[in-house]
Amino acid sequence: MRKFLRVNSPIILLENYSAAIPKPRWQVYGERYAERRAINKSFEFTWPQYQRKPLNQLLMSSLIQQTDSHCSYCDAYPLMSADNTIDHFKPKSKYPIEVCKWENLYVVCAHCQKEKGVNYDEKLLRPDEQGYDFYHYFYYDFTTHEIKILWGLPEEEAQRAETTLQIMNFNHPAMKESRRLSYEGFADRPDFPPNHKTHRFMFE
């Protein structure tokens, strides 16, 4: 999981919903979803429409920009059209108010969307949180192509690293194979554009 810097929230989420409802649009969307969930726990979320377009389509370009078209979690590249899904870091079923909050939205590949699913823990590391760095918590085993927890971490940090590996399932066989292929394909190509490599943290 490679660190990235989150860009500022698109103005569409921060603007007041209307003159009659002077609250940020993301908050109104979240409150409405929470109200419907309170009435019906099986109510399924659909992205709100803004000017006749689904909100997720309007946010996607900004989400992709901040990761250089890589998956926010595993750093897979390039994201295909089927991969362009938005993960709610805090699951919308448990945190409905944050369903459209900018800081809760991450563009991810289909694999990471499936593996993380609705799993969440407060210890879970975020790739854009202040102070996060891959090599502060993990190291890469170039023999097994596994991501492993760095030795000697303070207990709290070690727990966060372990929680992240478990929830994200970064050592799934498909992930290890993807990293192996990436390493073998790019290890001898130092001049290849860095942002066009998949799993960039291996080469840094």
Please give the residue ranges for each predicted region.
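Short Fe-S-cluster ligation motifs
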Residues: 98-113, 135-157
